[in-house]
């Protein structure tokens, strides 16, 4: 693993996608400048043949992470050693931090992604740029005091939904998948670490926009077992069908395969209601609005079943364009 340069930069919560796209475009421009400089060096007489070969190899493999790491280790010492007598080498040396292909991730919460910043997120996905987005889905505006967002499920209490939310959660992942060229995944690390890592690897390798939505238990959920059991809570959420694991990879459709993979096992629906009762955001409805709690909790379970059945249908359906006879 090669870790270099800034590990983190951030702007306002709601414009995290636009900010991240700007950072990505900035790196892209710097690397384009490197290509121009190396082409000038290749065409000129100031560099020896061996250096020109390295420059040509980097131009060909600059988007291959492993190759760019190896080539950077060879190119950087050469251009730095010749910086005083070669202007092109001096400029390349000043941009050497961009020789290695960077892994860039845009990270935000559900409030910004599903709700107040959704327009920005949609714009970034629609750009077609090779960006990676990770949404930490706490199902509530965690940073601003626990207000309900479009990620908040039916029956959960939050600010602006004091009697329990009455409409179902937005399916951000499926909305993004309708573009057809966006890699999408829904994960829960505590439920399946292998599936989470696989989704991250696939998103990083995919040449285009990607979005991963990760279930993230939050202090606003009021876990009765305590936040120290957040990973176990994720496992329970998937086991009972509250949260589902899946991946949508457009590259598979190009190969004539089904791009949608449902990674969740058949839920144990009999555990669903107990899962809700294990979190204060749901249990509070039973105390404050007992006459409505059963109806809301049943609606929450029905919504989860509806969503799971939809995913199961997508995992079985025929994809692609049907050819006429």
Region roles according to the model:
Residues 1-3:
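Short, small-residue-biased leader/transition segments that mark boundaries at the very start
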Residues 9-84, 88-91:
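N-terminal leader/propeptide and maturation segments of large enzyme subunits in energy/redox metabolism
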Residues 20-28, 114, 162-166, 186-190, ...:
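Hydrophobic alpha-helical scaffolding
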Residues 31-45, 59, 79, 125-129, ...:
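Structural signal for hydrophobic packing residues in well-ordered secondary-structure cores
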Residues 84-86, 92-93, 98-106, 113-132, ...:
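Glycine-rich ThDP/TPP pyrophosphate-binding loop and its adjacent helix/strand module
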């Amino acid at each position: 693993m090669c870790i270099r340069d800034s590990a983190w930069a951030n702007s306002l919560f709601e414009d995290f996608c636009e900010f991240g796209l700007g950072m990505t475009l900035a790196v892209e421009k710097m690397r384009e400048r490197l290509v121009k400089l190396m082409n000038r060096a290749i065409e000129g007489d100031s560099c020896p043949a061996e250096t020109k070969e390295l420059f040509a190899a980097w131009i060909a493999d600059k988007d291959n992470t492993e190759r760019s790491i190896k080539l950077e280790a060879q190119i950087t010492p050469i251009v730095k050693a010749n910086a005083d007598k070669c202007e092109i080498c001096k400029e390349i040396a000043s941009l050497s931090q961009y020789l290695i292909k960077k892994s860039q991730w845009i990270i935000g919460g559900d409030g910004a992604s599903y709700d107040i910043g959704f327009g920005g997120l949609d714009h970034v996905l629609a750009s077609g740029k090779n960006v990676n987005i990770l949404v930490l889905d706490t199902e509530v505006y965690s940073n601003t005091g626990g207000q309900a967002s479009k990620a908040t499920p039916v029956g959960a209490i939050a600010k602006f939904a004091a009697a329990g939310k009455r409409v179902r959660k937005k399916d951000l992942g499926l909305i993004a998948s309708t573009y057809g060229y966006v890699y999408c995944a829904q994960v829960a690390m505590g439920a399946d670490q292998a599936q989470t890592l696989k989704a991250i690897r696939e998103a990083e390798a995919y040449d285009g926009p990607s979005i991963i939505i990760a279930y993230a238990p939050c202090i606003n959920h009021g876990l009765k077992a305590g936040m120290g059991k957040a990973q176990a809570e994720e496992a329970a959420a998937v086991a009972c069908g509250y949260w589902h694991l899946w991946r949508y990879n457009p590259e598979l459709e190009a190969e004539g395969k089904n791009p949608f993979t449902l990674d969740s096992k058949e839920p144990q629906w009999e555990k669903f209601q107990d899962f809700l009762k294990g979190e204060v955001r749901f249990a509070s409805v039973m105390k404050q609005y007992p006459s409505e709690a059963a109806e809301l909790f049943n609606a929450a379970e029905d919504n989860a079943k509806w969503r799971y059945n939809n995913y199961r249908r997508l995992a079985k359906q025929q994809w692609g364009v049907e050819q006429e006879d």
